[in-house]
Amino acid sequence: MRVAEVVRNTSETQIRVKLDLDGTGRQKLATGVPFLDHMLDQIARHGLIDLEVEAHGDTHIDDHHTVEDVGITLGQAVAKAVGDKKGIRRYGHSYVPLDEALSRVVIDFSGRPGLEFHVPFTRARIGTFDVDLSIEFFRGFVNHAGVTLHIDNLRGINAHHQLETVFKAFGRALRAAVELDERAAGQIPSTKGSL
């Protein structure tokens, strides 16, 4: 079973993430940031990852620490669940549309953290959610999952649609990358023999 649970406590946030990479998309989300819960739901459902996230943060100041630290903790949990990476496909990509919006996400479980985030948001907030926090979420994730991640919103007018297509595509790309390949069972997906 490729499951993991990570607890991260700081003076700003207390976060618990539990996941099963071979799940069915079940989720239990309580971050204190409703729009983040909505986006995490997209990852779970489209990634077919069973996901529990519980967070308590200093949201009386703003949502920054909570969103960033959830990304960090999710990255740690994914890295733990993937383990030595033997037999995974390593790469994943997905294009996802939602009405006028279209996003592409490409991921590589390379062991080298890197983020290219290109989303020309059409407004600064989605409800009360600051769209810049999505960058902090993904930066936290890549730095702690050890992945290279390219995110491009190719078109979109509605900022909610722009970000929702990003998270849906991320879930689907993640699912593809961590999928086990029977033909490569027990093998590290690299000519170097390590990742």
Swiss-Prot record:
Main location class: cytoplasm
EC numbers, comma separated: 4.2.1.19
Pfam families: IGPD
UniProtKB keywords: Amino-acid biosynthesis, Cytoplasm, Histidine biosynthesis, Lyase
Record localization: Cytoplasm
InterPro entries noted in UniProt: IGPD_sf, ImidazoleglycerolP_deHydtase, ImidazoleglycerP_deHydtase_CS, Ribosomal_Su5_D2-typ_SF
Single Gene Ontology MF annotation: imidazoleglycerol-phosphate dehydratase activity
SUPFAM superfamilies recorded: Ribosomal protein S5 domain 2-like (SSF54211)
GO CC annotations on file: cytoplasm
Catalytic reactions on record: D-erythro-1-(imidazol-4-yl)glycerol 3-phosphate = 3-(imidazol-4-yl)-2-oxopropyl phosphate + H2O
One GO BP annotation of this record: L-histidine biosynthetic process
Pathway: Amino-acid biosynthesis; L-histidine biosynthesis; L-histidine from 5-phospho-alpha-D-ribose 1-diphosphate: step 6/9
Domain of life: Bacteria
Family affiliation: Belongs to the imidazoleglycerol-phosphate dehydratase family.
Protein name: Imidazoleglycerol-phosphate dehydratase
Species for this entry: Burkholderia vietnamiensis (strain G4 / LMG 22486) (Burkholderia cepacia (strain R1808))
Taxonomic lineage: Bacteria, Pseudomonadati, Pseudomonadota, Betaproteobacteria, Burkholderiales
